[in-house]
Amino acid sequence: MATATTLAIFAQAKQVTVTNNSDFNREVEPIVISINEKADYKSAVVSSDGNTLPYQLEDIDGNGHYDQICFITSLKKKEKKQFLVTLHKQEAEQTFTPQVYAEMMLTNKKIKSQNKQDLYISSLTVDNGTNPYWMLHHHGPAFENDMVAYRIYFDERQTIDIYGKNRKALELKETQFYPDQEQKANGYGDDVLWVGKTFGLGALRGWADNLPQMLLDVDKRTMEIVACGPLRTIVKVVDKGWNPFYPEKCDNAKRIDMTTLYTLSAGRRDCAVDVTFKGDIESLKLATGLINVKNSEEYSDGKGLRGCWGTDWPVSEKDSAGHKRETVGLGICIPADNIIKELPANSDNYPYVVKPALGEIHYHITFASDNETFPGSFHTPASFFEYLRQWKRQIESPVTITTKDVFL
């Protein structure tokens, strides 16, 4: 809640109407409104029916000015709600309880403990051929809400790995993705998936020679924490000057820029993946999908929704001491317009060949751990696959958002 507020006299207000046209309830619905970054707004008040709501101002393009605002609501089926969003040009003394967390850090070799690292960074860019995987603690940015946590490997794989939880809590600041034995005994979560060179949970790769290709030939690779709360985390991955024809060589004119945003909102286990491109992508083919967890059961609707449920060691054999086999459910939802082909499962992956549509790809990933003990958890393939079907219904029938300027 806001503890104190000191706002400017000059403000702009927007009346925001959100309509759930679906025949099902929406318990956690992020609402995102674009704002005029030239106005240089510094704070806001979001209210509905006399209640003030937490919000988050975001600078997606990184130019130092906020360009959108996010808040979260719930809606019953067919329900319509109105909100008043007032934007101010002065900063406000507001404190909202953090519901998400994100971190990226360099490994401090002077500190032996894996959950006491302290070299925090928010962005890193490396040149072609440079691999910072072993220089970064937990190998790249990590982000969470109280239900789930993700990390992205900072190397040519750019794999999404997962951290499952037993109870609802923010944990990464304390465990740094590597809980010690005392933390495990006290109910903290842990890494629950071994990904290797697979897609993990929905990594986007190149496609050439009828095979998925790692993003090996990239002029500059950047990973950045764009937003880290209080309501959602956004991690940006930029592959600037990527050769999409690898392993063949290409001249600079044929290289493209690929920017990927990974967005995790409070109260949701799924992560939105939004990919945009610069350059000639007319014939671009890409690959994504899910790791084929050992002995996993597969689900597919044949139209972009795919999942699996299985059990395996979450680490390599040499690191298995102190770990147990983990049971997880994984899911991916890709729009039909982006799908070239759904490929049969192989020993590593449940793969797709995909392409941009209108120059972009927007898909979603999700997972569940059998360790979860909180409401809304899943412990059978049948229940998880039913969740996937309902999840796709929500994705394909978004709420309607309209805005109208209001003069105060």
Per-range role (PLM):
Residues 258, 264, 269-302:
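Acidic (Asp/Glu-rich), glycine- and aromatic
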